[in-house]
């Protein structure tokens, strides 16, 4: 696997540029934007990523994933997604030992390989589904090793990946379903639902123009 091991030193990020990106990507959400700017200021102070990630909690359709993409854009990092609702076996994350015929690396190691570098944003969708393991252990326990910044070991590759350059951004609908150890790894941002009028504005001024741009109709 071709992975470039990068320094976890972060150059200063212009808060005004960060705000411009947030305004371009998100409608309203003033408290959310301010919380993200505070995180950027902290990064500028230490030149490292915070020891905690962001947990975005709110109903479906409130732009949680879009917030995560905007943060990755501000940090100028590649991003990858983990959909916890589709993961029911820890080996899907950690990989399986080479002693087995169908052994292969786990999703996390594959994400590092696809990004080509060790510094990236992990967008963990539906974190509140992470405890739904079936028989072979709890996927949430694997996430804890990824979030601890002590390095992540894949069972297939049998090597440790530095994780100090990983910034996790998780989404959830119901934070009461998330274990206390996992919750302790995140700063929680509650995302309020949009009104019907706000949804119309978002569709006409944000969603539709982006779709038309992708289709080259603008």
Enumerate the predicted regions with their spans.
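Conserved alpha-helical scaffold flanking the Walker A/P-loop in AAA+ ATPase domains
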Residues: 99-124, 155-160
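AAA+/P-loop NTPase substrate/partner-engagement loops
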Residues: 74-104, 111, 198-199
């Amino acid at each position: 696997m071709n992975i470039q091991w990068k320094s976890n030193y972060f150059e200063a990020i212009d808060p005004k540029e960060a705000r411009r990106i947030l305004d371009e990507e998100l409608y309203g959400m003033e408290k959310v934007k301010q919380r993200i700017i505070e995180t950027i200021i902290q990064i500028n102070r230490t030149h490292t990523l915070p020891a905690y990630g962001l947990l975005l909690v709110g109903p479906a359709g409130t732009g949680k994933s879009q917030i995560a993409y905007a943060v990755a854009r501000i940090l100028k990092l590649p991003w990858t997604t983990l959909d916890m609702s589709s993961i029911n076996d820890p080996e899907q994350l950690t990989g399986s030992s080479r002693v087995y015929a169908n052994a292969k690396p786990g999703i996390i190691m594959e994400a590092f390989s696809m990004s080509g570098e060790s510094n990236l944003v992990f967008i963990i969708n539906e974190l509140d589904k992470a405890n739904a393991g079936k028989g072979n252990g709890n996927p949430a326990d694997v996430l804890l090793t990824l979030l601890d910044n002590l390095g992540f070991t894949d069972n297939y590759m049998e090597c440790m990946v530095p994780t100090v350059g990983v910034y996790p951004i998780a989404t959830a609908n119901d934070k009461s379903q998330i274990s206390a150890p996992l919750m302790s790894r995140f700063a929680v941002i509650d995302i309020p639902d949009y009104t019907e009028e706000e949804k119309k504005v978002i569709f006409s001024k944000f969603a539709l123009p982006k779709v038309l741009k992708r289709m080259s109709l603008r």
